């Protein structure tokens, strides 16, 4: 079965190189992974390899349900997209949350009319973002994409498409020593950290999942580009890939404000496992990645963040891991980067966020385009 998006990108006419778009299918996953890997290696040869299972889920698995995406391929003689051709480009838009659309794309370095093709795909991203905004009933949605600061090629494409560089993120790494399994300081009096409670099935107790979600939402409310992710959206992302959820790497910090033994949630930490991999400079061992760390605003100043971080470090040491990684806003309003440096983290790379606010538009399926829209 070969399918086209109902409102596909308007691709440039390239003499001698006719192109068309179609919906991704299973055979496209490995060629797209190769494109992503080559683009990544061009700027960061030490990066972890592309996770093929994760990409497969995004392109043709459960995660594809929240995305609109196409691959670009050569055409058949009749102008339709070739079903058996390896993609030369891929673009995906995820309806992440109310007012937030995540963008991911790649174009082969030798693709014909590459700049024109990039412009066409970004224009389609704006089209798709506008449809998401209409469906959500919001005034706009924010197209968002993160790139390596060294990726000048991608930065030029995004700037030409109207996106703006808005933030820099520090990716930090801390080595782990075996003795840190039981040598780190404990939490302050009145603070404790525990893993989320698990059922015999291995799944977490619902109350703890909701507590972690609430702590993260409340803690990030005053951060840059913060957006509300409902619990339904949060849990849906977990359900999409339950095998990837490292429930043993979820922690809740609790605080006893009045000293009466009434422990209440004060912060949450969600982490995941980073497999060992080879790089251009040798092997990187297995590590822990801190996906989300949040402290409720009412609990700041009690050492909650340090307690959560130490819990993750000690756990990594017990598992024989050699590092703990995280990402932080270079201009964090809570100066979190300073805390991480004081605890041994060092910056290993930087990325940038590029954004574009897109207004909603009428449905192209139900209403014809106006002359202005088609200009």
Label every PLM stretch briefly:
Residues 1-12, 95-100, 107-198, 352-356:
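Acyl-donor-binding surface of acyltransferase catalytic domains
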Residues 1-56, 186-229, 365-375:
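Short amphipathic alpha-helix that is part of the acyltransferase structural core
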Residues 2, 146-181, 310-375:
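Active-site/acyl-donor-binding loops of N-acyltransferases
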Residues 37-137, 147, 261-287:
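Conserved donor-binding loop and adjoining core beta-sheet/short helix segment
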Residues 114-131, 292-295, 301-318, 337-342:
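Conserved acetyl-CoA-binding loop-helix of GNAT-fold acetyltransferases
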Residues 182-288:
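Flexible, substrate/cofactor-facing loop regions flanked by secondary structure
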Residues 223-224, 247, 261-269, 277-289, ...:
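Extended hydrophobic-aromatic, low-complexity segments
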Residues 255, 269-273, 292-297, 304, ...:
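Active-site proximal loops enriched in glycine and acidic residues that flank catalytic Cys/His/Asp
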């Amino acid at each position: 079965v070969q399918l086209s998006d109902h409102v596909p990108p308007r691709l440039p006419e390239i003499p001698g190189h006719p192109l068309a778009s179609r919906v991704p299918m299973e055979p496209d996953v490995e060629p797209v992974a190769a494109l992503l890997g080559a683009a990544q290696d061009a700027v960061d040869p030490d990066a972890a390899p592309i996770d093929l299972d994760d990409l497969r889920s995004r392109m043709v698995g459960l995660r594809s349900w929240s995305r609109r995406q196409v691959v670009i391929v050569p055409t058949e003689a009749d102008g339709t997209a070739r079903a058996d051709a390896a993609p030369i480009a891929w673009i995906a838009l995820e309806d992440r949350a109310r007012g937030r659309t995540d963008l991911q794309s790649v174009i082969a370095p030798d693709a014909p009319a590459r700049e024109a093709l990039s412009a066409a795909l970004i224009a389609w991203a704006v089209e798709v973002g506008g449809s998401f905004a209409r469906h959500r009933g919001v005034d706009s949605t924010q197209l968002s994409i993160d790139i390596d600061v060294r990726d000048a090629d991608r930065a030029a494409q995004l700037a030409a498409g109207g996106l703006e560089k808005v933030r820099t993120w520090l990716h930090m790494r801390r080595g782990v020593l075996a003795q840190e399994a039981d040598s780190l300081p404990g939490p302050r009096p009145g603070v404790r950290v525990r893993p989320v409670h698990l059922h015999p099935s291995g799944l977490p107790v619902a109350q703890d999942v909701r507590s972690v979600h609430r702590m993260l939402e409340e803690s990030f409310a005053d951060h840059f580009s913060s957006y509300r992710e409902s619990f339904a959206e949060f849990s849906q992302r977990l359900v999409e890939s339950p095998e990837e959820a490292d429930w043993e790497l979820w922690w809740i910090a609790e605080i006893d404000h009045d000293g009466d033994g009434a422990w209440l949630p004060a912060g949450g930490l969600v982490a995941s496992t980073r497999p060992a991999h080879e790089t251009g400079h040798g092997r990187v061992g297995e590590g822990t990645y801190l996906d989300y760390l949040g402290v409720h605003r009412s609990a700041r100043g009690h050492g909650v963040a340090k307690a959560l971080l130490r819990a993750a470090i000690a756990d990594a040491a017990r598992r024989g891991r050699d590092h703990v990684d995280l990402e932080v806003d270079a201009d964090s309003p809570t100066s979190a980067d300073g805390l991480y440096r004081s605890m041994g983290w060092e910056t290993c790379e930087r990325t940038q966020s590029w954004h574009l606010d897109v207004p909603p538009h009428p449905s192209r399926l139900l209403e014809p385009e106006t002359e202005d829209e088609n200009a």
